[in-house]
Each structure stands twice: as C-alpha cells, then as structure tokens.
Amino acid sequence: MTKIAMANFKSAMPVFKSHAYLKELEKTLKPQHFDRVFVFPDFLGLLPNAFLHFTLGAQNAYPRDCGAFTGEITSKHLEELKIHTLLIGHSERRVLLKESPSFLKEKFDFFKGKNFKIVYCIGEDLTTREKGFRAVKEFLSEQLENIDLNYSNLIVAYEPIWAIGTKKSASLEDIYLTHGFLKQILNQKTPLLYGGSVNAQNAKEILGIDSVDGLLIGSASLELENFKTIISFL
C-alpha cells in the first residue's frame, strides 16, 4: 500500500504563515503526491482548494449542511472551498471538547453520506496502556464500533494519547503490535496511519513497519522543511 503523510497544524500555525506554507508546499511537490500528502490547517488557514500536488483537509466540521450553529463550519462551507477531506475523532476533540461516541457516529455518518474522505482517529490513554495489551485492544475496538469499517473513503489514524505532544513516540514494538491487531479488524484496503510525537528523526523507522501505511504528524509538521523531510521517506 502507498505510504501517506498528513500534517495536522491544530491551532498552532499563524494564519498568513499557513497560507504561505500551503503555496510553497504546492511548488515543492509533484502531481503523484496528491493522494499521498495531506494538510489540515485550522479554519482560518484554509484556502480555496485549487492545489494539485497535495490534498487539503479540515480539522473539524459540524454535521449539517448549514444553519444556526454559532462558531461552527458545515459541509457547505467546505464544499464551497472544494474541500472533501475531514478529521474526525481526534483525541483533543474527544477529551477537551467532550465529543461523545454517539456524536462522532453522527458526524461520521453525515460526512460519509457526502462521500468525504474521513480520517478517523483512535487511541488509548496512559491508564489503559498500563493495564496491558488486552485492555488496549478492548479500548480501541470500542472506538471503532460505531463506524462503517467498510466505507471506501475511510482512513484510520492510531494516535496513543499518551504519546501526543510529549516528544516520546510509542516504541516500534508497541506500534508493530497495535497496528497488527488493528489490521485484523479493518478492511484490508483501509490505510492505517500512526501518529503521536512523529518527527523527522523517527519517521523513517516507523514507516518501515509493514502495518504502518503512513503518518499523522502534529508539531513536527509546522516547519515546512521538517515535513518535506518526512515526505521524502514515503
């Protein structure tokens, strides 16, 4: 399976720097990168999607066409920008913004109905990890229960919460075991990405694991040269 690199800017990139980054990345890449490189700026960092060398996606959207949803963007906003790729289920939205499994299912089903490419994020906390691998498997299985695992436009990203933003990635053995388990659950055509303190120093080793189909990169993607280095490993 072709390897993938995704940059999640979260809320860390200044707006105009984000715009400049996207334009410079477009100049750097080639057409064959279009379905292999993805960038998720924050809402203000989004531009009309005329990019031909990478895929532009949104970090979040409310599951409605439009309406009285103060502070949200909806499918019509994204479609107007020609954006059809969306992150759903990131741990920061689950934990900080209290997005429940039922709401994530609603969001998934709505954007599946719009034929969006959905990057669905899962991952366990440290307490669960410390209980052992059986507990991790049960936790991750529950996170996948409410979505259609045979949806053809699905990508799953495994991000252990305890590794996000800590500068301490999961060990290669942990990634190998966890991805091996998840591959047994997922449709064989569904790409499975790893995220959690991925950087230019560890990306090549992680991508070397057969069951890792790509990377979801946070802070290490904020500097274009770092992201370009990671892309070179694909």
UniProtKB/Swiss-Prot annotation:
User: Which residues constitute the catalytic centre?
Assistant: 90, 159
Q: Which domain of life is it from?
A: Bacteria
Q: Which residues take part in binding substrate?
A: 8-10, 165, 197
Enzyme Commission identifier(s): 5.3.1.1
Q: Where in the cell is it found?
A: Cytoplasm
Question: Known PROSITE patterns for this protein?
Answer: TIM_1, TIM_2
User: Main EC class of this protein?
Assistant: isomerase
Family from the record: Belongs to the triosephosphate isomerase family.
Q: What protein does this entry describe?
A: Triosephosphate isomerase
